[in-house]
Design a protein with these regions (language model features):
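Mature, function-bearing regions of proteins
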Residues: 1-135, 142-276
Length: 276
């Protein structure tokens, strides 16, 4: 009963049952094969939540990326909807049937083609800009991978880390990215090169607070949500925390990591009893 309850709570979080959404079924005919590193990294609920929040906060330090999200999404009113959309896209392109994944990619490309605008300072942005696509992809990949390494596979080899970047680069290229980094070192070099483009302003601070101070969907979920947020801030690089004006979690870092590891192991146990 406990196992079923935990599984249903997670499925409700990531699938809009009112809209008829069901969990993505794993297929042997996916874009990425079952023995890929990405299948390991993207299959853990806790680390994907932690990595996803950390990635989002880092990604939005780029003013052009933030502009597109701020002006064209319901970031303030529907954060759960945005979380579901991102999680389902990753699940479909990792585990779903090949045709299903390709259709999801085409839908995103269509949406991106209409996301254009101008920042308050006059700079133009567009969501299908290959440079911005690479930034979002690389920041996300680094943090998903690092969350998995911290709480799931701390002894992962550098060869497997490089394999992961090479595997997921194909998704970024299908979305319109060019010269997408295909190794850990290439990804880190890309981030270092982009750092000069990052900045914070009132929008960034508002976005940070919308993410980190969002109320839990249910009171019973508030402690876990607070833990995920603390673990995400802890996972971020020091320079990104500093730009956001964030400090290490109020709880000691070892306590946050231990509690997050416990949560991850509990959910792995819950999902080990049947299909995800």
């Amino acid at each position: 009963m406990i196992r079923r309850y935990l599984v249903e709570r997670v499925r409700d979080r990531f699938n809009d049952r009112a809209a008829g959404q069901q969990p993505i079924q794993r297929s042997d005919n996916a874009l990425l094969p079952p023995d890929s590193v990405a299948w390991r990294v993207h299959g853990d609920v806790t680390t994907m939540m932690v990595g996803g929040i950390a990635a989002l906060l880092v990604e939005m330090l780029h003013p052009l990326a933030l502009g597109g999200v701020w002006d064209h999404s319901k970031v303030a009113s529907d954060q759960l909807g945005r979380l579901r959309m991102t999680a389902r896209f990753i699940a479909i392109t990792t585990y779903g049937e090949r045709d299903q994944a390709k259709a999801a990619i085409e839908r995103v490309r269509m949406v991106h083609s209409h996301v254009v605008g101008t920042l308050p300072d006059g700079r133009a942005y567009r969501a299908d800009d290959p440079h911005l696509l690479n930034w979002i992809h690389v920041a996300g990949s680094i943090h998903f991978l690092d969350a998995w390494r911290r709480f799931g596979e701390p002894q992962m080899t550098m060869a497997d880390q490089d394999r992961y970047f090479a595997e997921v680069a194909g998704i970024a290229e299908a979305l319109g990215g060019t010269e997408v980094p295909k190794s850990r070192s290439a990804a880190e070099e890309f981030v270092a090169a982009v750092r000069s483009e990052l900045q914070t302003d009132d929008r960034t601070r508002q976005f940070r607070d919308l993410v980190l101070k969002a109320p839990a969907a249910r009171k019973s979920e508030a402690p876990v949500q607070a833990l995920v947020m603390a673990a995400a801030v802890d996972l971020m690089p020091a320079w990104a925390r500093a730009m956001h004006g964030l400090r290490r979690p109020p709880l000691s870092t070892p306590a946050v990591r231990l509690a997050t590891l416990g949560t991850a192991r509990t959910l792995r146990w819950a999902f080990s009893g049947g299909p995800r």
